[in-house]
Amino acid sequence: MLKPAIIIVPGALHRPEHYQGIVSRLHKLQYEAVAVSMPSLSSSPPQPTWTEDVEAIRKAIFKFSESGQDVVLVGHSYSGILISEASKGLSRKDLPHGEGAVVRLIYMCAIAVPVGESLTGQLEPRTPQEVEAFREEGSISLLDADKVRDVLYNKCEPKVADWAISLLGKQPVTTMSTPATHAAWLEIPSTYLICEDDLAVPECVQLRMAKQGNGAFDIVRCQEGHAPCLSNPDLVVRMIRNAAGEAIEI
């Protein structure tokens, strides 16, 4: 049976290179896998919305789906919104028999929003626990380089964190305030990886998003920070394989 293709969508500031450890491991397991470059990253002038990012993801999907291969989309952080938008009209129920579909969405400490909300809106503290979490852990300013190591890469080895920081690009702020037009997690089976030691998107905020939709998400937990692909790539690969249909323990 043909395995689904795995498409990884980078989070804000990040490039495909940040996810190559996952891609290479999946290749060794006979998965077709790719991390997609986002046109908005370091764009000049800055792109006003995520529209071109979504189009880049859809092109990657069609590369596999047009030949009948199903696809699993993996979104990290900000790109949770993008994988939902890119899946519009591509679920199994939307497509005729024989065409590949988006069969699962994976949210890695990612933003999952209802229609009409944005990343910035979803990260506004809504409970006393969330207010306290942001006060103690600090919500990252994308322009504050001094916080990047501690907030994004707190569970990574120092050399890995240095390398990751050296690759970071600039993220147009307006892409993060663009409201969602589609909530694919309500119609496509979805997995949410809660990273309990995440200092960028606190655990309680991840849990709130993962509990949306009356059980829409299969919830998986790990004791990683905001960059599990770098701090524990083997765990992430096991999680992806499980979500893709393999009967393995995470």
UniProtKB/Swiss-Prot annotation:
InterPro entries: AB_hydrolase_1, AB_hydrolase_fold, Sec-Metab_Biosynth_Hydrolase. Keywords: Hydrolase. It comes from the Eukaryota. It is an enzyme of class 3 (hydrolase). Alpha/beta hydrolase; part of the gene cluster that mediates the biosynthesis of novofumigatonin, a heavily oxygenated meroterpenoid containing a unique orthoester moiety. The first step of the pathway is the synthesis of 3,5-dimethylorsellinic acid (DMOA) by the polyketide synthase nvfA via condensation of one acetyl-CoA starter unit with 3 malonyl-CoA units and 2 methylations. DMOA is then converted to farnesyl-DMOA by the farnesyltransferase nvfB. PANTHER family: AB HYDROLASE-1 DOMAIN-CONTAINING PROTEIN-RELATED, ESTERASE_LIPASE_THIOESTERASE DOMAIN-CONTAINING PROTEIN. This is Alpha/beta hydrolase nvfD. It comes from Aspergillus novofumigatus (strain IBT 16806). The gene is nvfD.
